Amino acid sequence: MSRGKIFECEVTVSYGVKEKLQTKHRIEIWEVEEVIYDDPHAFSISYKDCHFLYGQTFSGRYLLVLVRVLSSEEILKLGFMQGTKVLKIITARDMNSKQRKTYNKRKGTA
């Protein structure tokens, strides 16, 4: 488990993923951004080039966000400066009870 530089990044999301999050999971992109940028207790579990981000929105919603770290080539194709860390949102959903328990334990409120 890691905490740190992954949260100092830019975020990108495809139109299709954005639509799916809104219609299937009832999640807005700004909620995902709150988890990534604003939750001081957020943490990630890494698997290959993907990260499962555990976090909470200002309204108290517990979200599990799956992101992929983009390669240098992908970053340049999107028009970001070289060396910028960019996360591509793959999906997000509400945490289940076990995941909320893990989050709260890490946060120190379990």
What is each residue range found by the language model?
Residues 1-110:
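Ribonuclease/tRNase effector modules and their secretory precursors
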